[in-house]
């Protein structure tokens, strides 16, 4: 059985994969074409927010890969960060399941299942670390 620190490192690898999967999204979802009718400020805010979300996910991955023992320690900072990460990923589960249109989820069933399982896994790992 893996230690909690090892599970956190696995979670870091999962977060890294999520971040990497988001990199080609602008092309795949045709951001430029789909945002063409939006005002310039809306396009700019959209691109900035999308980039920052990916940056944050990469930051979570780095935190998990480089400092797993701190996150698993049960000390206040580790518990706080683990709680935040657990809540962040927990909130992502219902977004995946209920916010995105069912038809789009069906068209991309494998990706939908992989991401949903990943978000649930991350919630559990960081939830366990938060309760130590």
Question: Model features per residue range: what roles?
Answer:
Residues 25-44, 99:
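Cytosolic, membrane-interface loops and tails of multi-pass inner-membrane proteins
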Residues 46-51, 83-85, 108-121:
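Individual transmembrane alpha-helices with interfacial aromatic-anchor signatures
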Residues 13, 17-26, 41-69, 83-91:
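Core segments of alpha-helical transmembrane spans in multipass integral membrane proteins
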Residues 124-132:
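Juxtamembrane boundary at the C-terminal end of a transmembrane helix
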Residues 89-102:
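Transmembrane alpha-helical segments of integral membrane proteins
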Residues 1-19:
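Hydrophobic transmembrane alpha-helical segments in integral membrane proteins
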Residues 5-6, 38-43, 70-81, 104-115:
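Non-cytosolic membrane-interface motifs at loop->transmembrane helix junctions
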Residues 55-60, 118-125:
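Hydrophobic cores of alpha-helical transmembrane segments in multi-pass inner/ER membrane proteins
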């Amino acid at each position: 059985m893996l230690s909690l620190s090892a599970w956190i490192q696995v979670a870091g690898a999962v977060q890294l994969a999520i971040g990497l999967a988001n990199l080609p999204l602008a092309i795949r979802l045709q951001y430029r074409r789909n945002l063409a009718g939006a005002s310039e400020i809306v396009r700019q805010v959209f691109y900035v927010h999308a980039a920052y979300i990916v940056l944050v996910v990469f930051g979570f991955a780095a935190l998990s890969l480089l400092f797993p023992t701190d996150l698993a320690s049960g000390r206040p900072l580790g518990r706080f960060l683990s709680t935040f990460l657990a809540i962040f990923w927990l909130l992502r589960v219902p977004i995946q399941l209920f916010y995105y249109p069912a038809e789009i989820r069906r068209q991309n069933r494998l990706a939908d299942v992989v991401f949903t399982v990943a978000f649930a896994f991350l919630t559990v790992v960081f939830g366990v670390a938060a309760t130590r």
